[in-house]
């Protein structure tokens, strides 16, 4: 995706974080960070004096959130998960923010959408901080097929279109 995007052709900026938990990814456990066994997506809001996962969550909050007008979190199923493609979007937020996130979710060609009241993940805490956001889940057993990668990239382009970036 990074090689495909032409910054001059975009209205706005795309920030890509291709792998936030590389240690877990390469050890076959994307859900947890091996350093402390915690699920990063349950550590928000982070703490600068907390576990490694909590500190990483805090760094993401401090560096990514201030730069984001919208946050799209892309996940793949871990080794113990078989997922049907779906989107989680926040609803435990002010109505305007919930509507922005729901409309963004509706703009993506993903078959299922889940209205979520979660508050402790990257996307859901971003929404608590005033940033419209959603989470796309796709893949299973720790793997993504070529078709799933293509579909995920297509979703990113759909989101950029929805946001008026293309």
Which residues does each PLM region occupy?
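Structured catalytic-domain cores with a bias toward divalent-metal coordination
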Residues: 1-166
């Amino acid at each position: 995706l990074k090689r495909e995007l032409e910054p001059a052709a975009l209205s706005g900026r795309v920030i890509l974080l291709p792998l936030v938990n590389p240690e877990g990814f390469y050890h076959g456990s994307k859900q947890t960070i091996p350093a402390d066994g915690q699920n990063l997506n349950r550590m928000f809001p982070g703490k600068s004096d907390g576990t490694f996962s909590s500190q990483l969550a805090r760094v993401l909050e401090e560096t990514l959130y201030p730069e984001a007008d919208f946050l799209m979190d892309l996940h793949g199923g871990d080794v113990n998960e078989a997922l049907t493609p779906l989107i989680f979007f926040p609803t435990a937020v002010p109505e305007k923010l919930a509507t922005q996130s729901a409309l963004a979710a509706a703009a993506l060609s993903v078959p299922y959408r889940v209205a979520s009241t979660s508050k402790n993940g990257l996307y859901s805490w971003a929404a608590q901080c005033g940033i419209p956001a959603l989470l796309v889940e796709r893949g299973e057993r720790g793997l993504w097929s070529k078709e799933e990668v293509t579909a995920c990239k297509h979703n990113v382009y759909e989101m950029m279109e929805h946001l008026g970036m293309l």
